[in-house]
């Protein structure tokens, strides 16, 4: 069928080189680099382009990095089959090409390049408002109870959706034809809706057409920014702690490159009625359970009224710290902010210990904020918190016998616990109450 593949042995990073392929004819590729390739996947916050971030004009003007290459994958979805190729091309990073490229991906790649000084390739694989089920293959979905139910229901749901779409289209077409016959030229001609299998929210549809084509391609790792679309119910957010590990393990299986680093963004602060505390907890649990995952905490750089925060520079920077630590094994890197370790109750106080304290704990404001404490009645009160000997002591005069503490357990919390490397603590809770 004219398809073939050549696998080259690993070579020293560098370039540009020329690649010659000779058979009955010859093909020459020039300006080829050898370096590390990262997949940049997720929904709209991964897709958000450089032109929409804070200070975009200055960022774009200074984006001259010939050793960074950018590849944007075309939007295409199919639940029923995979494809082997995508539409797109490698572009040299400059002010023209970076303008519409993933901001998180670019800032991540830029920070990496500055630190390791090898060519960096970034593959932008984003689609707004998409849920994790669309990015996960059927095999992995079957490992999760909620995913298994979707896989088993898909044939009927797809058929029903397509039939409903045709009924609606035919009804709209009759109305349109009637209007035209009566001389009404204001109505727009109806269009057929997308078949269910082509819907980017359908199971495995984005994995099949946007991820699978790269599974034979050598990569260093993945960065992932997604979760908003899976936070519309508490159960969906809780299920994510099964979906995310299942997706990660299946991608690693399909790439056949071992347990490559998978780095993701924990959702930031944002005022909404979604279930972001539970989603952040699902992400935290995934991070703690898999040593080759990294999590960039962003609880301090979201925006109260905008689900697409403008500060993507710090997101990329924090992901790059995870990469330098996990993927490149750089010594002396503090890649993470404080992560809750344990709680000890002494009289009316809860004493909290943390991992990843770096050079020590500190508050970004005069007094620690974001902590709540509860007794056996499960009623949480705002707490007074202070840093004492590398631990956090939490107290409230309303709680004489504390049993649980929560930190940042809101959609849009005010949080101030950091390490001295200025990396924020992840939100957490010590209880498991519903």
Give a label for each model feature.
Residues 1-434:
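Cell-envelope and extracellular/periplasmic
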């Amino acid at each position: 069928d004219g398809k073939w593949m050549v696998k080259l042995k690993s070579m020293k990073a560098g370039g540009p080189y020329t690649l010659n392929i000779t058979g009955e004819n010859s093909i020459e590729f020039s300006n080829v680099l050898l370096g590390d390739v990262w997949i940049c996947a997720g929904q709209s916050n991964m897709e958000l382009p450089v032109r929409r971030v804070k200070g975009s004009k200055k960022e774009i003007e200074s984006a001259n990095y010939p050793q960074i290459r950018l590849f944007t994958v075309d939007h295409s979805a199919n639940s029923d089959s995979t494809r082997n190729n995508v539409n797109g091309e490698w572009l040299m990073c400059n002010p023209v090409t970076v303008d519409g490229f993933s901001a998180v991906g670019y800032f991540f790649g830029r920070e990496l390049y500055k630190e390791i000084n090898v060519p960096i390739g970034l593959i932008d694989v984003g689609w707004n408002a998409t849920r994790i089920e669309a990015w996960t293959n059927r095999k992995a979905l079957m490992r999760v109870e909620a995913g298994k139910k979707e896989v088993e229901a898909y044939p009927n749901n797809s058929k029903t959706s397509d039939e409903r779409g045709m009924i609606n289209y035919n009804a709209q077409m009759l109305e349109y034809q009637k209007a035209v016959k009566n001389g009404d030229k204001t109505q727009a001609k109806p269009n057929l809706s997308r078949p269910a299998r082509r819907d980017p929210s359908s199971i495995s549809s984005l994995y099949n057409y946007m991820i699978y084509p790269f599974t034979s391609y050598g990569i260093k790792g993945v960065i992932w920014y997604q979760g908003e679309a899976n936070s519309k119910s508490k159960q969906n957010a809780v299920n994510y702690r099964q979906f995310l590990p299942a997706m990660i393990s299946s991608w690693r299986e399909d790439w056949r490159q071992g347990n490559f680093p998978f780095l993701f963004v924990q959702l930031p602060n944002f005022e909404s009625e979604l279930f972001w505390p539970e989603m952040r907890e699902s992400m935290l649990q995934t991070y703690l359970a898999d040593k080759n995952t990294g999590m960039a905490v962003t609880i301090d750089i979201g925006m109260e009224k905008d689900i697409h925060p403008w500060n993507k520079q710090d997101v990329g920077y924090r992901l790059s710290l995870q990469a330098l630590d996990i993927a490149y094994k750089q010594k002396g890197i503090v890649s993470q902010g404080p992560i809750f370790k344990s709680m000890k109750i002494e009289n009316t106080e809860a004493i909290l210990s943390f991992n990843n304290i770096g050079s020590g704990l500190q508050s970004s404001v005069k007094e620690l904020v974001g902590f709540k404490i509860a007794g056996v009645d499960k009623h949480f009160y705002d707490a007074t918190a202070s840093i004492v000997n590398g631990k956090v002591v939490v107290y409230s005069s309303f709680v004489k016998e504390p049993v649980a503490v929560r930190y940042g357990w809101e959609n849009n919390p005010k949080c101030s616990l950091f390490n001295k490397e200025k990396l924020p603590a992840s939100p957490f809770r010590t209880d498991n109450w519903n």
